[in-house]
Amino acid sequence: TTESLDMVIKGMNWEQGDEAVYAQQDYGAMQMMFEQVSKRYGTVNRIVSVPNHPSSDEEIVSLYQNAITSKTKLLMVCHMINITGQILPIKKICQMAHDKGVQVMVDGAHCVGHFQFSIDDLGCDYYGSSLHKWLAVPLGTGMLYVNDKHIDSLWPIFAEHHKEPG
């Protein structure tokens, strides 16, 4: 999950003053990648704190909505928070963020194979997951979903080599 989501964060075309939104409860390595991007490009990280016992989905959606500004480029949200096991209202968060022109990247490290859902139904732009946790595949196996409309705008962080035939 970390490597796949790092590819998105590092692959975006960041400019000074761009903003990212994420939560205190997000995985530490993801927070550190946003810190690296901030140091390198002068971006701003807006950090929210998800309550352990929210009164409704709307409380969580509002939390993220209130952190978004006209400079917000990417919102990262955990599908399931690893500390508490909370499953967040991803579809509602994506709809809200998209209404504001913000892309959404979902950390789904604990979800694929744990419970049933459809990435298409969530409406996110990016979804990364660790597959070894619930699918009994080798440690380190993961996946990254990128919505078709964003593929061409992500910079590859690994070079590839194509040798011409002949």
Stretch-by-stretch model annotation:
Residues 1-16, 28-31:
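Conserved beta-loop-alpha segment that forms the PLP phosphate-binding cup at the N-terminus of a helix
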Residues 122-166:
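Active-site PLP attachment segment
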Residues 44, 55-108, 134:
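Active-site phosphate-binding strand-loop segment of PLP-dependent enzymes
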Residues 23-32, 49-58:
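Gly/Ser-rich phosphate-binding catalytic loop and adjacent alpha/beta segment
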Residues 41-51:
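Short beta-strand elements in bilobed, periplasmic/extracellular small-molecule ligand-binding domains
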Residues 21, 46, 105-107, 128, ...:
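Structural detector of well-ordered beta-strand residues that form the stable sheet scaffold
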